[in-house]
Amino acid sequence: MVEDRSAAMTAILGNPIKVIVFALLSMSGSALAVQPITDLPLQQDAQQRWHLPAGEYRGSFSVDSPMQIVCEPGAVFQAQGQGNGVTVSAPDVTIEGCTFLDWGHDLTAMNSAVFLQPKARGAVIKGNRMQGQGFGIWVDSTHDASLIDNDIQGDPTLRSQDRGNGIHLYAVRGAKVIGNHVREARDGIYIDTSNGNLLQGNTLEDLRYGVHYMFANDNQVIDNITRRTRTGYALMQSRKLTVTGNRSEQDQNYGILMNYITYSTLRDNFVSDVRDGSTGDTMITGAEGKALFIYNSLFNSIEHNHFERSAVGIHLTAGSEDNRIADNAFVGNQRQVKYVATRLQEWSIDGRGNYWSDYLGWDRNNDGLGDIAYEPNDNVDRLLWMYPQVRLLMNSPGIELLRWVQRAFPVMKSPGVMDSHPLMKSTTETLIKEPIG
């Protein structure tokens, strides 16, 4: 048998082409092989945690039993451009403090730095650094995962659509995604068909969408920050979302986009400096730098938010009616409201409306409310949309005369938005200040 094997090797080595093929096959096999994490030089401490010493660990690894893995400084998983960095298929696994580099970039195969399989219930992925072309963390059909304080960076040399998402939840329940920093990936956090999850305190920069919801219900989006994305918060086909205390700064196209959203709450959010740009997505058209865009969304509460210095403050269309909109501030937007529908919408609740920086009314009884209604998209506004050059006369006596005629002869009015009790002062000053950190 030894002689036969030796003869075979001699035959291979005697042919240069066969040598190359043999080497390539050997390299491919070793790169694709998934190794048990227990093959690494793990050291257990008194708290039953397994420590991975500093060093570069090449290849893909699997965790198939409950354990806590803590990487010492300098411990690096280098997947050599193939597959996942680590695949977890057991419950109650913790991976903390590790660095993941150069995992696979096959998005169809869902290549990820850390891939949590359905059996990985209760996984904790904490304080890791990830840099690569595929997905950062993919959580697949499991419950109660905690993704905390991870730093995830994509590859800016690739087109946005060719990168993986920083964090991807699919069919997940009870996940906590807290304090992560994601940049230069495709979407920062993508939530698909996943209910009852919490996204809190994440920073999401230089992405397509910062937060992207699809078919996900009963989720909380709290105190997150998006910057320089092509849409800060893309909320689509979902219900019962609680979106509070978030910030959108210098995003393109949309700060917050609501598409088929129902029975949800938007409160205490701050959106500023949204400018127009390319969405890179055929699903969404008409991007004009809108702080808030509401498309075919009903029965939502939108209260005590601040929208400023954007091309459009708020745009409603496609049957977006029966929403509670009050106590918001619309400040310094080039166009405060764009509304396309067939019936009048009242934007005040219990005698209190919104603050509009371009409101020209007065408050003779000092009750903090304007004495005349604010109508941001009356016939005069429609005239300004059709002929932008007329905007030079915006506050002229002629324009005010047209508005007076419209109020005096309401038969001329077309359906639009009315705020019957506009606020004379904004109530959202506390939202304007820069966040700590």
Model-inferred region functions:
Residues 18-28:
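Bacterial N-terminal signal peptides
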Residues 79-87, 107-117, 131-139, 159-170, ...:
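Extracellular beta-strand/beta-solenoid scaffold signature
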Residues 42, 57-70, 77-97, 101-121, ...:
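Extracellular beta-strand-rich solenoid/capping regions of secreted or surface-exposed proteins
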Residues 101-116, 123, 146-171, 176, ...:
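Acidic/polar low-complexity surface segments
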Residues 149, 270-293, 300-304, 308-437:
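Functionally critical loop-and-helix segments that line ligand-binding/catalytic clefts
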